[in-house]
């Protein structure tokens, strides 16, 4: 197949404002030609499906990579929302005379598309992942949850990354997770604990972001599997170790071994083993 886009650096039409490879993050118009498309997607999701979106923007990859963030919800509702999201995006794209793809890696040598999964556990009205006295304001319960997900990360990939194309995305150098580790802001790690909002005022936002899943996966299976892995970590009190602040992409193999940082499966066959 081939991809044609007025935004792409290989465009021959001369009618757009092409972006260089991996230079598509938050561009302004006229380079970003898809703002009206995303606006329409957000309106349809909200008005016809009751799905609220936090924000939308152009993403790193060229040729029209977009991100629309769905507001958090209970697990089953969130999975329903993810499926509805795909349906809406594909149909609105058709109305705009375009084709939307959920392929994890449609363009070689450019960033792929993920389905980052954010999780928090609540007990009545209390977010059990929040503790103001702990590092990154992440509670011990939250640490154990991360430990469980890391413990089962290799097995999870068969569910979170179910196609051969999925593993074209999981390679170093494109902000995709490859290494089984956790951090506050490290995009080379599988787990991130967002920390840009701090304090008890934002306790409800404390969460774990699992960056491995991609949009080719089944969200019902992904959310269930990630939850099961995390709960296993809580049950067995699995420690995730220290958060990794350094860029793991730049570490040597010996440095990673010394730090106990393992890698995700390199292909679907290994994930299924």
In which residue ranges do the predicted regions lie?
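Glycine-rich, acidic/polar active-site loops that bind/position phosphate-bearing ligands
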Residues: 1-273
């Amino acid at each position: 197949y081939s991809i044609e886009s007025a935004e792409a650096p290989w465009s021959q039409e001369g009618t757009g404002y092409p972006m260089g490879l991996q230079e598509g993050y938050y561009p302004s118009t006229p380079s970003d030609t898809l703002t009206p498309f995303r606006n329409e997607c957000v309106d349809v999701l909200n008005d016809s499906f009751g799905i609220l979106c936090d924000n939308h923007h152009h993403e790193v990859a060229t040729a029209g990579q977009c991100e629309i963030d769905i507001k958090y919800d209970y697990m089953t509702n969130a999975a329903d929302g993810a499926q509805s999201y795909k349906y809406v995006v594909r149909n609105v794209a058709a109305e705009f005379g375009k084709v939307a793809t959920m392929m994890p890696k449609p363009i070689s040598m450019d960033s792929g598309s993920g389905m980052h999964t954010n999780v928090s556990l609540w007990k009545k009205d209390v977010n059990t992942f929040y503790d103001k006295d702990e590092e990154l304001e992440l509670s011990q319960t939250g640490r154990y949850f991360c430990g469980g997900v890391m413990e089962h990360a290799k097995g999870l990939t068969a569910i979170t990354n179910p196609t051969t194309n999925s593993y074209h995305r999981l390679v170093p150098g494109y902000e995709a997770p490859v290494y089984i580790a956790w951090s506050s802001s490290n995009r080379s790690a599988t787990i991130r604990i967002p920390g840009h909002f701090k304090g008890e005022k934002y306790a409800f936002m404390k969460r774990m972001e699992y960056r491995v899943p991609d949009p080719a996966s089944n969200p019902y299976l992904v959310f269930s599997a990630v939850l099961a892995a995390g709960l296993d970590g809580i049950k067995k009190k699995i420690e995730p170790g220290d958060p990794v602040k350094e860029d793991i992409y730049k570490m040597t193999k010996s440095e990673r071994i010394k730090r106990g940082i393992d890698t995700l499966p390199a292909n679907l066959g290994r994930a299924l083993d």
